[in-house]
Regions:
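Short, small-residue-biased leader/transition segments that mark boundaries at the very start
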Residues: 1-6
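Flexible, acidic glycine-rich loops studded with aromatic residues
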Residues: 28-45, 49-181
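Alpha-helical scaffolding segments of alpha/beta enzyme cores, especially the outer helices
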Residues: 13-20, 24, 53
């Protein structure tokens, strides 16, 4: 136990040094939610990738939080189980799942610490920009609507109509989006 505490203290101190270093130049430090478990400066942003429980814990410690749950916003996961899908890292996050994301249960004061939603695309299997676009679109539309709209309950059928129009607009700059199912 003693050595574990020493490692946690050193990790926290190192994190604080980095946060102070970037803050002096006017930037904010952002750490993955594992680092948010350390008792660190409340100005350090926590990127909550492991889910709403970790996001809520970071908020309750006073950290600003960016929601990036791997269960909904990891766009390097498959969009469909169809065998025609390009190779992905694993997992399955279809469009409906992105659209259906529920924010963590927080008080209004706690919710003010949530600074936004973010999708991540890790590119180990995505060897060109066309594949990155394919994995992002149309899921990025669902994420954007979830982030910027307060309609509840959300109407997936209505969203799909809006998404179809948006995908038409993306054809002009030749974005390689996945078609709607």
């Amino acid at each position: 136990v003693g050595s574990e505490m020493c490692i946690r203290d050193r990790s926290r101190d190192f994190l604080q040094q980095i946060a102070d270093y970037v803050r002096k130049d006017g930037y904010d430090a952002i750490v993955w939610d594992e680092a948010g478990e350390l008792e660190a400066d409340k100005h350090i942003f926590v990127m909550a990738w492991r889910g709403n429980d970790f996001a809520a814990a970071a908020v309750r410690k006073g950290h600003p939080v960016i929601l990036a749950p791997c269960s909904h916003f990891y766009f390097d996961y498959y969009q469909s189980s169809a065998p025609t899908e390009p190779k992905a890292i694993g997992g399955l996050i279809p469009l409906r799942q992105v659209y259906g994301y529920e924010l963590p249960e927080l008080s209004p004061e706690e919710a003010s610490k949530v600074r936004g939603l973010q999708a991540n695309i890790w590119t180990e299997y995505l060897y060109d920009m066309g594949l990155v676009e394919y994995m992002a679109w149309p899921r990025a539309l669902a994420l954007a609507e979830r982030a910027w709209s307060d309609c509840d309950p959300r109407d997936y059928k209505s969203f799909r109509s809006r998404a179809a129009l948006a995908l038409k607009l993306l054809e002009h700059p030749a974005v390689n989006s996945r078609p709607l199912d």
